[in-house]
Amino acid sequence: MKHLVTTALAYTNGPLHLGHARSTYIPADIYTRYLRLKGEEVIHVGGTDNHGVPITLTAEREGVKPIDIVDRYHNAIKADLDSLNVSFDTFGRTHSDIHIETAQEFYSKLKENGYIYEKEIEQFYCEKCDMYLADRYVEGICPFCEGEARGDHCEVCGRHLEPTELVNPYCIHCNSKPEIKRTTHYFFKLSAMQDVLKEYIENSPEMPEHVKNMALRWIEELHDWDVSRNIKWGVPIPGCDDQVMYVWIEAPIGYVSFTKQLGDLWKDYWLENTGDSKISHFIGKDITVHHAVFWPGILKGIGGYKMPNAVVSGGYLTLENKKMSTSKNWVVWVKDFIENFSSDYLRYFFMINAPLNRDTDFSWDDFQKRINTELIDIIGNFTHRTLVFTERKFGSTPVVDLNQLKDEDKKLISKCEDTLNRVDSLIREYNFKDALMEIIHLAKEGNGYFQGMAPWAIKDEERLKEVMYTCSVALKYIVYLLSSFMPEKTALLLEYMNEELDLEVRGNPLKKPKVIFTKVSDEDISRMKENLMKATKKAETKSDEKSKKVKSGEKMDIIDIDYFGNIDLRVGQILEVEEVPRSKKLYKITADLGDEKRQIVSGLKGAYEAEELVGKKVIIICNLKPAKLCGVESQGMLLAAEDDSIVSLLALDRDLPVGSKIH
């Protein structure tokens, strides 16, 4: 059987961090290396995703073209992957002729097959910039937690948002308030695929169970999918001058277009009726639905393509038990890690720390402990003492009469063969943690055998040869099985053993071994922790400076008196104050405006006790568009001033009746 292994396309808006490495790239490389080790035909396809709003935003901030950002980070990402010893047979980019042509062919075929249609939608439009605003071009206040949020996501509370849900939205280019207009977008009729996709998922025996369950839940409520965007940077929609394909319809097509870079070979892996092949997609958990539902839907809509056999979804990675954040620099970049430690140590730690489908944490202390007390004290100990003792006593691996081996020798060799079979099954099931545990257990058995045989005390040279031959067999199996996980260290071991990467022990002359596995020192860990805190502090300083600029009004536009006159400001009096459920900041306030009572949601909790507010006369904006905060409708806004942690309601210096207008 042929194997096609793909990794999620890295987005060219920044370099890789440890989360990317753990969920996707390291496990995919281990799987590919193992299949190749077993003599199976496999190609590993990877590349970068180069389109979409975040790239255009970065380019605009830096005053360069989007292609400049793409080129920079495509090269940086490839360098990061090389440093992790993640290798590919083909590595492409979506901003290339072959990809754009392939993506447009897919789109046209979907349209020809009746799966693309036009539909009017509501979208923010900026009059000042004369453009429709994609989700990342709009920012405002999260309606759930009152944090600053983007049009698609609130980083404070983690919720997915629609741009039109934002409170006080503004265009990120000019800071003016956008209006909602109707525009025509193109939709993929994904809802028509419900039965087909359900059958596909239920009849995919190699699909991991947690992926199946997630996909089936989504398929139950399948909706059509908006697949166009009003931006210029992307794959142009055929026959449309002002919209491009949404990245999540065109980026997965990269798996096909990048395989095409290998020539006609691509057909054997992707087209139906071209032989037996297996497709495995390695991805992060956050894009499971895109690969298990949307992408198969596209392939079904095109027709004639093989379907993915497995979507291998890696869990989230936290850092020191906190969610990673690139904007806050609470992250460890691959480049920074590799400058200080072997990539093999990272590959080992991530695969042994937790099953791939589970979320896990990267802690510098745990990393040190795992490497020193597990990898080095068990595997490193057995490999080093076997090589050193054998080289010193014999200069080469002993050749013995296998019929003369004792039961205890045969027991360890039998353990090697059992481990080989178990590791094979586990890796093919994408169970990398348990596969690695089997190798560790074999090394433990080897250490126990070495210690029990006490070769330093054996006087009979033939018996000593049998013992060290048995240790060398175990060593060869460990190196063979470990090679997919730790290619650098095992290559060094093979060099000292003067052996090939197979299971045969040839009796070759040994090279004088050096220490291969070196411990991670306390000084190393202290330095990395300190670097992390410095980077985070630097990001906090930048964030504080940005907040001060906003507070000082540096971003505000000049307005005329007529504009100000449109704001209905009146004196109100607070009658009742209640806490808003699930919110740490919000009160639900009932205010008297003279001719009516209003419900207002305000973030004064923590600054004022509820009883302090009752009876206060305040200034209220009365003609603000109603908005929901944490599910509670707010029909106005109380005015307050803020400086760092101090919040103060605006008050009158003379008593005026409620309802009085402010000019």
UniProtKB/Swiss-Prot annotation:
Its cofactor is Zn(2+). Binds 1 zinc ion per subunit. Zn(2+) binds at residues 142, 145, 154, 157. ATP binds at residue 326. GO terms for biological process: methionyl-tRNA aminoacylation. One of its GO terms (cellular component) is aminoacyl-tRNA synthetase multienzyme complex. GO terms for molecular function: ATP binding; metal ion binding; methionine-tRNA ligase activity; tRNA binding. A motif ('KMSKS' region) lies at residues 323-327. A motif ('HIGH' region) lies at residues 10-20. Keywords: Aminoacyl-tRNA synthetase, ATP-binding, Cytoplasm, Ligase, Metal-binding, Nucleotide-binding, Protein biosynthesis, RNA-binding, tRNA-binding, Zinc. CDD domains: Anticodon_Ia_Met, MetRS_core, tRNA_bind_EcMetRS_like. Residues 563-663 form the tRNA-binding domain. SUPFAM superfamilies: Anticodon-binding domain of a subclass of class I aminoacyl-tRNA synthetases, Methionyl-tRNA synthetase (MetRS), Zn-domain, Nucleic acid-binding proteins, Nucleotidylyl transferase. Its EC number is 6.1.1.10. Homodimer. Is required not only for elongation of protein synthesis but also for the initiation of all mRNA translation through initiator tRNA(fMet) aminoacylation. Belongs to the class-I aminoacyl-tRNA synthetase family. MetG type 1 subfamily. This is Methionine--tRNA ligase. It comes from Methanococcus maripaludis (strain C5 / ATCC BAA-1333). The lineage of its organism: Archaea, Methanobacteriati, Methanobacteriota, Methanomada group, Methanococci. The gene is metG.
